[in-house]
Amino acid sequence: MALSPEKEKALAAAMSQIDRKYGKGSIMRMGEVSSKLAIEVIPTGSIALDIALGVGGVPRGRVVEIYGPESSGKTTLAQHIIAEAQKMGGIAAFIDAEHAFDPVYAARCGVDVNNLLVSQPDYGEQALEICEALVRSNAVDVVVVDSVAALVPRAEIEGDMGDSLPGLQARLMSQALRKLSGAISKSRAVVIFLNQLRLKIGVMFGSPETTTGGQALKFYASVRMDIRRIETLKNGQETIGSRTRVKVVKNKVAPPFRQAEFDIMHNEGISRAGNILDVGVELDIIRKSGAWFYLGDDRLGQGRENAKQFLNENPALADEIERLIRAHAMAAPISIVSPKEDDAVEDAGLFEE
């Protein structure tokens, strides 16, 4: 509906005053900046997870939380996101609050460790100030904080071992996210917080699991992913990897409660070939007949491991299949986990916790 000339004139004067006071672009019509409507993303390294996220990856200019039990693949997933950002020509930073970063394994996940920025802060405030400085530089595309549980407030480090300091870490996270959220949006960086699980005492109904660092991160995160190891992969008696399931328990950019499964192998991280096979079969791009896998009339291999090996040896074919999958993915039905069936941390609608 068109505005009356008087209202249009008053609105133009108000917008002009706001621009003069706070800078050009402080207020704008969305129709004038249609390019900002598109959601920019960085792929996760797992095509199944890219589909589950609904937009093809983790959204830029947002806070993302990845949480799960120990050895579930949190750091591996974050390192694959870093690798994808670097492939796109981006700069990534890894804030290693746990002091457990393994550059050899990161390189196996595809990370260019020579150009990766790494910081091992002494306490939580230092870690978050470094994160803020990197974000405000507008030069970094991905910042990973590993992990929230290891962001120990300075007062706790300088105090005695038995001191009780309730709520200190939660207040630290709340203040940091208030300062960071605007800067993250303007810089178009993805800030990924890895988090651990704790058990709440005395919970009779629902999941007793909760994440560390208080409630603030749950609200500020646009995407929250629960990652779990569901199966151990073996070659005879030797363990070679794990089958992993990721549930998108909160998503502000697409419908939530979707899930993805993929293999994490000890020598390569997320198995790209295995993921392409699984999703290709689900979308009928790859045909499975008995033990054989086919692309059209061409055989890829007998058995999943042989087909994976064939794709690893023919990266151009793997790229073509991935392109076909991405072209068809948004129109394909994706399994959605009901919030009642979800055994993850209590969470999350589309827009609110």
Swiss-Prot record:
Supply the alphabetized keyword list.
Answer: ATP-binding, Cytoplasm, DNA damage, DNA recombination, DNA repair, DNA-binding, Nucleotide-binding, SOS response
Return the GO cellular component terms, semicolon-separated. cytosol
Protein localization: Cytoplasm
**Which SUPFAM superfamilies does this entry report, sorted A to Z?**
P-loop containing nucleoside triphosphate hydrolases (SSF52540), RecA protein, C-terminal domain (SSF54752)
One family from Pfam that matches here is RecA
Q: Name one GO biological process term.
A: SOS response
Q: Tell me which residues bind ATP.
A: 68-75
Q: Which domain of life is it from?
A: Bacteria
Q: Which family does it belong to?
A: Belongs to the RecA family.
What name has this protein been given in UniProt? Protein RecA
